[in-house]
Amino acid sequence: MTTPASSPSLKALLNPRSVAVIGASEDQTKFGGRLYKTLLQHHYDGAVYPINPGRDQLFGLKPYPSVADTPQAPDMVVMALPRDKVKDEIAACAARGAKAGIIITSKFSDAGPEGLALEREVVATAAAHGMRLIGPNCLGLISPANKLVLCSSPAVNVPRLIEAPIGFISQSGALMGTLFDRSYGMGIGFSHCVSVGNQADLELNDFVEFLIEDERTQVICSYVEGIK
């Protein structure tokens, strides 16, 4: 983590006014397609900016060639791009004024020294513009309290979200998806669920501190594999 996270910076992640989906599509075999579909499926009520230069329409919305072409800077961007494209895309989003981002892409510090070096460059690029990041190598987040789903897990393909005053922060994306799925089957919901991935910028403790102050969260659960 570069600097401690403030409540406003995490609010841009968990309750953004607008979201740009980089690589949005209607193809459900692709991460960008699943992220985009589930965001719309759960009736997120902020502005949605699908980013895809090759399409005229995606699920009824106008896509934009790049984040630089959106009507306003998005609070949040989410991407699942090939690793070698992430740094340039983060640079473009940060320069546009995006406040926060989720990087689903893996093979950064989780794949050795070369990936670690690139991960540090990505974080530095974002930090130079005050942009905060979840990931890389994460499943994203689920925020029923805000009707926000930016998660690549098939567990979120449900008819409706169940909101309850339980926050869950996980260092394992797979476990977050499994817990969400099993809880949903028992009628149990959440306020926010976050997969923190490599914690290159924001860490588990940042979100725990946010949830302590969150009015819609009364119980905090976490899955911890290690503490830095």
Q: At which residue positions do the language-model features occur?
A:
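Catalytic-core regions of core metabolic enzymes
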Residues: 1-228
